[in-house]
């Protein structure tokens, strides 16, 4: 399990380190990538992360103008496809936007072609996929931000939600809804588990007080989407029977950005 909270300069390197650690310490036979409430970030990092799951040299994302003319394209590189040998589940929700939608949508597009073993689970993403440029007005006292292009996924789907649109973002292969109270409780547990007490020198200290346990998301039924994802992975790899949801099989990794 890897949770990405954003896309910054070091995201792909931290992701690679997390995967390497999992392969070294465990028999890694499936991966959950959590992009829920990920607001996005750097496009090149989204392309780099998506490339980890996509073999070959196919397109990952394109930009198109209002008339649908392709202006630019980012393609996969075979040498960067490092996680193509295991089933993958990507979690998204209405808080997944921009770069996270590009990752989820690109992986989904190739999975639907049968090129990779992956599904997207959760709720429809936010729908933010526009390219904007800033133009300064005469005198440099004011500026105008103008949308010039939109992002397109490999299957031609437009990410951005336009006024009155009924189709946008990334639609999960498997929709699993959660109540607002469940979302809040799960988010609070994750946030509190990620906070580490430090002393005045910036060193992590043990206060002796019990810390929130991320495994409670599963064992206490707080995160239905994560629970479904784990059951699906277990069903694909000689794991416990469906319906039996054990504690997380390995330490989760959060890449904070």
Segments (PLM) and residue ranges:
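C-terminal "post-core" interaction segments
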Residues: 1-257
């Amino acid at each position: 399990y890897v949770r990405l909270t954003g896309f910054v300069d070091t995201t792909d390197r931290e992701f690679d380190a997390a995967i390497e650690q999992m392969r070294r310490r465990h028999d890694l036979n499936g991966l959950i990538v959590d992009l829920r409430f990920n607001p996005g970030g750097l496009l090149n990092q989204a392309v780099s992360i998506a490339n980890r799951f996509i073999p070959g040299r196919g397109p990952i994302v394109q930009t198109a103008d209002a008339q649908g003319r392709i202006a630019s394209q980012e393609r996969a590189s075979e040498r960067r496809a490092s996680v193509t040998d295991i089933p993958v589940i990507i979690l998204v929700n209405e808080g997944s936007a921009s770069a996270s939608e590009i990752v989820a949508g690109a992986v989904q597009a190739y999975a639907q072609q049968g090129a990779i073993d992956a599904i997207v689970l959760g709720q429809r993403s936010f729908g933010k996929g526009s390219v904007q440029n800033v133009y300064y007005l005469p005198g440099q006292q004011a500026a105008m931000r103008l949308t010039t292009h939109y992002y397109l996924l490999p299957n031609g789907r437009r990410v951005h939600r336009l006024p009155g649109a009924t189709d946008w973002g990334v639609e999960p292969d498997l929709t699993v809804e959660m109540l607002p109270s469940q979302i809040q409780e799960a988010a609070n547990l994750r946030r509190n588990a990620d906070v580490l007490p430090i002393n005045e020198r910036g060193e992590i200290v043990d206060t002796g007080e019990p810390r929130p346990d991320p495994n409670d998301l599963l064992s206490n039924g707080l995160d239905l989407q994560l629970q479904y994802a784990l059951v699906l992975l277990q069903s694909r790899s000689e794991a416990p029977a469906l319906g039996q949801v054990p504690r997380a099989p390995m330490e989760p990794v959060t890449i904070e950005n």
